[in-house]
Amino acid sequence: MHILRFSDLCAQGQARGQRVFIRADLNVPQDDAGRITEDTRIRASVPCIQMALEAGAAVMVTSHLGRPTEGEFKPEDSLAPVAQRLSELLGREVPLVADWVDGVQVAPGQVVLLENCRVNKGEKKNNPELAKKMAQLCDIYVNDAFGTAHRAEGTTYGIAEYAKVACAGPLLAAEIDAIQTALANPKRPLVAIVAGSKVSTKLTILQSLSKNVDGLVVGGGIANTFMLAAGLPIGKSLAEPDLVNEAKAVIAAMAARGAEVPIPTDVVVAKAFAADAPATVKKASEVAEDDLILDIGPETAAKLAAQLKAAGTIVWNGPVGVFEFDQFAGGTKAIAQAIAESSAFSIAGGGDTLAAIAKYGIEKDVGYISTGGGAFLEVLEGKTLPAFEILQKRAAG
């Protein structure tokens, strides 16, 4: 995928004295008092901003925060807490600028934060008039927000159409590289883990991956539907019986390519979904009518771990059990440890997956951890993300 990279422009001295507009993803969670509860995204945006400042650029940064009503600014929509945290991380004051669409004053070597871009009328619908105005603010547009790469909005797509130069920041470029390594030119065998509560939310991902991967591991409620498709009892477990035919089709598509969807041979069950519910390991064929399947069993986990250790590339989206409760965490822990020990290139994404990676302390052993959420899922579906598409188009001239 050919795109212009901001790091290359900086290295060539092309950013010196230029006005640089960075679209970052600073959409962080806040408590009721507006305090930031988790600042990973702000920290992840710092390298791009530092790069621009060190290159001698006049730097403007913006992001969305929450879901404001376009055209109506409310105090709770303000990026003020983000500006404060960014100031601390950069060791310099980061002024917050409101009503910025018609002009921004910023000198080379300075950085300003432009107020919540989703307050601007026309941002979400990618209004061309707004996009042209924003493009006039800068010499170089930098997209460094993978989390919104799947949305064609004013600050993620429109501005890139009209800016003099449009390029990818280091965070977005790293995502593109990792995705290319994992999906476009994977070292085989390529094994994907797709878990979650519902087949319906990830059906297109399962269908897309079944055409490309050598092993497709399903977990969580998704695995229960696949167990039904394999004729196994699942008791009162979460499943979607109306999607059994779709699950069978995915199994058949994999089998036609000589690949497989491993169905659990043993499971961990309980009579209730609770933190203190006693756990019992059972053969998959012996699940009782009042059982809830809440994890894969140790035999299944060991088989999957062996498969992951032998893989060339691993894509991980979703924990395979209710890992928040320790008695149902064995499967997810075994998979996390196998990925950590595997020599495969691994890419992981999705909120619950990131929580599992943090719980088992394997951050340093995962090849690439995607910050994307919805954007990561759309990549797995085989879609070209709008942000990638426009940057490729601009790079091609």
UniProtKB/Swiss-Prot annotation:
Broad class of the protein's primary localization: cytoplasm
Cysteines joined through disulfide linkages: none
Keywords from the UniProt entry: ATP-binding, Cytoplasm, Glycolysis, Kinase, Nucleotide-binding, Transferase
Recorded metabolic or biological pathway in which this protein acts: Carbohydrate degradation; glycolysis; pyruvate from D-glyceraldehyde 3-phosphate: step 2/5
Lineage: superkingdom: Bacteria
Subcellular location: Cytoplasm
UniProt catalytic activity: (2R)-3-phosphoglycerate + ATP = (2R)-3-phospho-glyceroyl phosphate + ADP
GO CC, any one term: cytosol
GO MF annotation terms: ADP binding; ATP binding; phosphoglycerate kinase activity
UniProt keyword Hydrolase, yes or no: no
Keyword Translocase: no
An annotated GO BP: glycolytic process
Subunit structure: Monomer.
Family listed: Belongs to the phosphoglycerate kinase family.
Cited HAMAP family: Phosphoglyc_kinase
Name the UniProt record assigns to this protein: Phosphoglycerate kinase
Native source organism of the sequence: Acidovorax ebreus (strain TPSY)
Gene responsible for this protein: pgk
